[in-house]
């Protein structure tokens, strides 16, 4: 994990510990530098990361302020940090662990049809199934994987164990009806609605390392999204009445 990411996590923990609410102001850049014993550029990178995650916002000339927190039990559609930090009592069941080539369209997202680690998992929150997940990790990029690792946080293993930096993702979503095999795992009926998400995650150099299909239980999954604190400029010449 990069130094600015560690600092960002510490600032987020500070917000939680001190029960800061929407509109509360963070310490100044100078105060944060002194508190965490890092340079100005590291603090600015950490603030930028927190801004992108929808945790804080900047007001020019005034400082950095806390944004509203997400509701309990809601998962961010755009956060790449995984489920564990937002869900209550999450558990993971590894249904299948194998080595195989990905099918279309997953091999297209990976730009490769090489042999991958294939992991099929059922994720639960407070004992209730909320997502069925099928993931492919190219062996040329993720050289080692095990069922034991898959039972925990794969992303923590990639970041902390393999020292790889996870940067961004592409998501394609649609609503459809459940197949019989999916319904069995999600404890629903065949033909019930679901949200299907195709996820591709990339390393810092732009290499795709994870292509996944996630099928969400419509009864046990709730989502939210927050735009980042970017200045949006609108050209009124393009607006129509």
State the predicted function of each range.
Residues 2, 37-38, 145:
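Residue-level marker of alpha-helix boundaries and capping positions
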Residues 10-66:
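N-terminal helix-turn-helix
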């Amino acid at each position: 994990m990069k130094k600015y990411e560690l600092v960002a996590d510490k600032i987020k923990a500070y917000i939680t510990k001190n029960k800061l609410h929407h509109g509360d102001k963070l310490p100044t850049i100078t105060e944060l530098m002194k508190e965490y014993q890092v340079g100005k550029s590291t603090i600015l990178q950490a603030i930028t990361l927190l801004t992108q995650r929808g945790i804080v916002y900047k007001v020019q000339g005034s400082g950095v302020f806390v944004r509203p927190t997400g509701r309990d039990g809601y998962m961010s559609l755009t956060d790449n940090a995984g489920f564990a930090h937002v869900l209550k009592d999450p558990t993971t069941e590894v249904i299948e662990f194998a080595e195989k080539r990905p099918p279309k369209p997953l091999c297209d997202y990976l730009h490769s049809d090489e042999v991958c680690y294939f992991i099929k998992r059922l994720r639960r929150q407070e004992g209730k199934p909320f997502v069925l997940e099928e993931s492919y990790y190219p062996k040329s990029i993720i050289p080692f994987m095990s069922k034991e690792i898959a039972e925990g946080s794969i992303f923590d293993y990639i970041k902390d164990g393999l020292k790889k930096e996870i940067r961004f993702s592409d998501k394609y979503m649609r609503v459809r009806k459940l197949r019989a095999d999916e319904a069995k795992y999600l404890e629903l009926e065949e033909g019930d609605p679901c949200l299907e998400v195709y996820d591709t995650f990339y390393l810092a150099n732009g290499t795709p390392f994870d292509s996944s299909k996630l099928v969400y239980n419509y009864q046990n999954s709730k989502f939210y999204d927050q735009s980042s604190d970017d200045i949006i400029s609108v050209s009124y010449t393009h607006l129509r009445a």
